[in-house]
Amino acid sequence: DPEDYMARSAVKWLIRLGVNVLTMSPGKKDYGHHNYPLECIEKAMAWLKLHGNEKIGIAGASTTGTLALTAASIFSDISLTIAMTPSDFVWQGFMQGKKDGCKEWPIEGESLFSYKGKPLPYMPFRYQHPDYWRIISEESKRTGNMVASRKLFDDSEAAHPITEEEFIKVENIRGKLFLVGAEDDALWDTAKYIRRMEKRLAEKPHSCEVEAVVYEHGTHFVFPDGMLKTMLPVGSALFVKLAFSAAKKYPRECKTARIDIDRRMTRVICDWRDKK
């Protein structure tokens, strides 16, 4: 949802750095991603240019971190890409809501994203409805996390090794690429995915300048500390502790990671903003 509280809070943090921000969403109150048309990004870029924005950057976290990478790999006008806890491949589309007692389910034959009317090649999930949600629910209870889908992703990749066409072509990204994640991410193995992207870039010609950082402890919420405080002025650290078990065990390390992310991301954005 473009009016989502977390999205609006992220916008406030970014605006303080002197950049204009436009939020993107599949639809109002829609937290699923299935065949999301990348033409929406194209239209947004055109609108921003029409209104005097000469530079285009894109940022996302979690699934939208993967969206940011995918869009930047296709649209060469994007000169800054920030991906927090992303995957390096496109996966099967999913919906959220209520269905047969499940809060989320994959959609057969649909990708996370589409372009020119066609779904992008994607990794199918090992578990389909209703087993998909059962696995997530069981793992969340077992690990003490708000959401734990790492087993879902690990088992899916084991059953269906990711093909070249399913990997995001990060070597096509222009300008600055900033990747951030944590080893203890409960949703998916973003640390592995980030290292895989670094390896891909080392092996392929590319023009982007990449900065990748992976923290031992940071959870799925690898947000800049100031951004999280904007979202939750009181109790931001407590909220992360309640959401993810790693934050309960390593609160100081998670806090230190968020402060470092804030410093790094602020520098990256300001350098890009000021570059002639």
Identify the function of each model-found stretch.
Residues 82-170:
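Accessory cap/linker subdomain of secreted extracellular hydrolases
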Residues 5-24:
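Short amphipathic alpha-helix adjacent to the substrate-entry channel of hydrolases
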Residues 184-188, 219-222:
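Acidic catalytic loop of the alpha/beta-hydrolase fold
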Residues 195, 206-276:
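C-terminal catalytic histidine-bearing segment of alpha/beta-hydrolase fold enzymes
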Residues 24-57:
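Catalytic nucleophile-loop/oxyanion-hole region of alpha/beta-hydrolase
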Residues 173, 179-181, 185:
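Short beta-strand/loop motif that positions the catalytic acidic residue
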Residues 175, 189-203, 227-228:
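Short alpha-helix in the alpha/beta-hydrolase fold that links the catalytic acid
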Residues 65-76, 81:
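Short glycine-enriched nucleophile-adjacent loop
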